[in-house]
């Protein structure tokens, strides 16, 4: 991470020397991913570029991860490549009639809620601000969502109040065999606690599109944990 920051510092300083006063990042990238110490030494401000990104695309990706986990698509793919068509260990569950817990019902979370509703799932959600457009959603406290959801999908920003919101305590409150999906921010999940939960088989499966410290965790400690 320090090496990455040094590279960004060089880039920013070079831009400032060429008269750049503003840097903008696309709306899908959290500004916490773009912070580094060099920003204090040069006069280049940072802002979001509110481009026309698709909340539905992110939500569809979240459901794709959930489906891949549920139906063991990664295992099935590898087996078929080896001419192995055994169904042993590939049984999932029907999402129909199950409970989906959506943490954060902004644009992406709301899109995910609609997708889950279309699957015939009961949709519950946790958010400080309840959306009046989601009349099929029941808002509950976080503890209730954790305890009753078969699928939990994270769609909230990374702030001090949400940092490591998925930790050993909240994991222990979840149902055994829950599916957890995170397409929001890696820092929402405490990596060590998640790994412990996976090893203890708390989860049916986990689908992650973001990681807290990718260079430290993804390619080393978790490289052999695919199951």
Residue ranges with predicted function:
Residues 13-18, 34-41, 128-136, 217-223:
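Short loop/helix-cap segments at secondary-structure boundaries that form the rim of catalytic
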Residues 5-6, 28, 150, 156-158, ...:
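Short glycine-/small-residue-rich Rossmann-like dinucleotide-binding loops
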Residues 21-23, 41-46, 135-142, 224-227:
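Active-site regions of enzymes building and remodeling cell-envelope glycoconjugates
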Residues 48-99, 111-114, 118:
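Phosphate-binding beta-alpha-beta segment of Rossmann-like dinucleotide-binding domains, i.e.
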Residues 88-176:
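Rossmann-like dinucleotide/phosphate-binding beta-alpha-beta segment
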Residues 47-48, 168, 177-227:
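Rossmann-like dinucleotide-binding domain for NAD(H)/NADP(H)
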Residues 1-47, 147, 167:
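An N-terminal-biased, well-structured beta-alpha scaffold segment characteristic
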Residues 26-27, 45-54, 127, 184:
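Short beta->alpha connector loops at strand-helix junctions that form conserved
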